[in-house]
Amino acid sequence: MWPSNHSDPQPETCISNPNEKGGSLDLAQLPMELRNNLMRSWPSYSGTGNPAIFWQLEWRKHGTCSFNKFNQIKYFYEAFNNWNGMGLYDLLRFEGIVPGASQTAPKTYDKMKFIEAIKRRHFRDEVTVIPQFYCNKGTDLREIRMCIDYNGFEYMNCTGTSTSLVGTCGNQIQWYA
């Protein structure tokens, strides 16, 4: 969950001193149920493989920019609830969009297939919010972003630079597990 605003679409590290209040994630403050949920929804795909280190990095880079609105517990609950409410993996699978078995055997899809599936299944064709797609090497799907309003309740189109509006993927996306 990355806070943004219209003048600075992706602010980062808003509390730069880790010793300042809110500057460092206090894992002990996160309830065990929340940590277990985050293990499922927000694993680490980085080299460390340690989700706690990943969550700390995400908090420092993005969460600190919402600290005046969401404390650490609320920030991670909101991130989990938004992930859980979207049900993106199931939604895509229901539409026949599934990852390939590995990086050497990815499946390739047209980006519009993802967009139409999300609009049809999540928004029931009633909302015209367009997700952002971020890829490695222009085609390897890394993340799908959906922007949410200041209060964390309503989906909205993302604001920002042209890259942040459309993402970094081309029209063809490769996806693998």
Question: What is the meaning of each model-derived region?
Answer:
Residues N36-A177:
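C-terminal, well-folded lobe of enzymatic/effector domains
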